[in-house]
Amino acid sequence: MTFQDLILTLQKFWADRGCLIVQPYNSEVGAGTFNPATFLRALGPEPWNVAFVEPSRRPADGRYGENPNRMQQFHQFQVILKPSPIDIQDLYLESLRAIGTNPLDHDVRFLEDDWESPTLGAWGLGWQVWIDGLEISQFTYFQQIGGIDCRPVSGELTYGLERIAMYLQDKDSIYDVVYSDRGGKIVRYGDIYQRAEWEWSTYNFEEADIAEHFAAFDVCEAEVKRLLYRGADPAAKGAAIDPKKALVLPAYDFVVKAAHRFNVLDARGAISVTERQRFIGRVRALARAVAETYVAQREALGYPLLGEQQAKAAE
């Protein structure tokens, strides 16, 4: 199965089971959890079933395109099921069959591994999924997002597409994976991404302007506050956010951008251990403010995705 067909198969599998198939977020994210289709929609009582591919960028993980399985950009396939169904594990195993891997013929293990994202103030009870000694997925029950309890709990499935493709094609290097094969015309993963890995690794480790990134982080932080406290001074005593006026989605966009600026600075070695914790705390505070405002906003709107009776019960 090619990399391209792997994505198409998972999309069809989850679409057939009631998931919306949405598109990747159009900003740099470290994981699919940063996509607002996860971070925001996992909050509050409204049901939400969605699946999407998320190109994920982690600047410090770059290896100039020389490491066979470690990159600064990779792809996750993320599924959010809210509320989490009782048979979520069975659905996951069924999805493995859809991509040509019968769990009965392989050593599939769920190894306890609770998940946490300090910058997002998020955590969940979870398991790594290993097949024949290789980790291919993460399975999580979200407990908190932005420091807010998740009620109901969402089930998250995250497929590591590169690892799965290497496993299915029996390749030792991600760059040898067949991305597409149409009538014998083969395009490999490395044909598309290997040069990009070298360029972005060079940028992240050597060329990123440190002063500009520090300044941009401050701008992002200020924008989040301005967009949430729209029409009020966030520094004023007693200032409060009006959820109906707040621009939650643009504010969250700047949270994501601030997190990426921090990650680039971290890759450049520009942040000390002490500063690192302080910056994580700053991003987490922004994420929490956005999450709280989003929850208040959805309530003020009457929970549009709930039926009328459910909305009244949730109030």
UniProtKB/Swiss-Prot annotation:
Any one cellular-component term (Gene Ontology): cytosol
According to its UniProt record, this protein's enzyme class is: ligase
Subunit comment: Tetramer of two alpha and two beta subunits.
EC number, as in UniProt: 6.1.1.14
User: Hey, which family's this protein in?
Assistant: Belongs to the class-II aminoacyl-tRNA synthetase family.
**Catalytic reactions of this protein:** tRNA(Gly) + glycine + ATP = glycyl-tRNA(Gly) + AMP + diphosphate
Keyword list (alphabetical) reads: Aminoacyl-tRNA synthetase, ATP-binding, Cytoplasm, Ligase, Nucleotide-binding, Protein biosynthesis
Its name, as the record gives it, is Glycine--tRNA ligase alpha subunit
Q: What is its main location?
A: cytoplasm
Task: Spell out the molecular function terms from Gene Ontology.
Answer: ATP binding; glycine-tRNA ligase activity
Which Pfam family is an annotated match for this chain, by its short name? tRNA-synt_2e
Task: Set out the biological process GO terms recorded for this chain's protein.
Answer: glycyl-tRNA aminoacylation
User: Source species, please?
Assistant: Sorangium cellulosum (strain So ce56) (Polyangium cellulosum (strain So ce56))
* Subcellular location(s) of the protein: Cytoplasm
